[in-house]
A protein has these predicted regions:
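Active-site loop/lid in soluble adenylation, ligation, and acyl-transfer enzymes
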Residues: 1-16, 30
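Metalloprotease/metallohydrolase-associated module, dominated by Zn2+-dependent proteases
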Residues: 10, 14-23, 40-88, 105-207
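Conserved, charge-rich beta-strand/loop surface module that forms ligand/interface-binding patches
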Residues: 25-29
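Extended, charge-biased low-complexity segments
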Residues: 33-35
Length: 207
């Protein structure tokens, strides 16, 4: 009763994963060894450290997961397919999980991927910390935001959520969070506004 991996599944996942690597001088997700695809959401046993000697343990439903230690990535196919079918809703499971892979490239799950210079790290930290705090505040007060409030969980989830918005809702992200958009455009070395399916007027570079 397992899921047969068809060309549609392989190509849908690969095409979206490759989008994050365009124009970047990088290896092809060097930490990733395997991708497991479920037909739909699945249940996993989770144990979380809450601080001090406090742990939380139980089962949770998941759509996807990235495991650095095992070099693995898990996706629910029905959600991955929905994300590909609607490229402008700001939610994309494949982009989200592969963004975690980029975050892991420097062996730290902190929302700061490997950057080229000290100045880039400083600029990244300044903008990301401010924007992360703003999203947490929005999540607590119920203020509408371009970003999925799941990104308020921690810096790693914030990076993955902003990646989704950067590629799927670039116009809205740049309008509401221009410095954040600029940091991601610098990191990914592309401007998704040039090809986005997001509704709105296209802006072409004039040179």
């Amino acid at each position: 009763g397992g899921l047969e991996l068809t060309d549609e599944i392989r190509l849908t996942i690969a095409a979206q994963a490759c989008l994050l690597l365009l124009h970047r001088k990088t290896d092809y997700y060097p930490q990733l060894a395997s991708i497991l695809v479920y037909p739909s959401s699945y249940t996993a046993h989770e144990k979380r450290h809450l601080g001090a000697n406090i742990w939380e343990e139980g089962d949770e439903h998941r759509l996807g997961h990235t495991g650095r230690r095992l070099g693995s990535l898990v996706l629910a196919w029905d959600d991955a397919r929905r994300g590909a079918a609607n490229p402008s809703d700001g939610r994309n499971l494949v982009l989200h999980e592969f963004a975690h892979q980029l975050d892991f490239e420097d062996y730290a799950t902190d929302g700061a991927p490997a950057l080229a210079t000290k100045a880039e790290y400083q600029s990244w930290a300044r903008v990301m910390s401010r924007e992360f705090a703003a999203l947490r505040s929005a999540a607590e007060t119920g203020i509408p935001t371009v970003l999925d409030i799941y990104g308020a969980e921690n810096p790693a989830e914030f990076f993955a959520v902003v990646t989704e918005a950067f590629f799927e809702r670039p116009r809205a992200l740049r309008a509401k969070h221009p410095e954040l958009y600029a940091e991601f455009a610098r990191f990914f070395r592309q401007d998704p506004i040039q090809y986005s399916a997001e509704p709105g007027r296209r802006t072409l570079n004039k040179r």
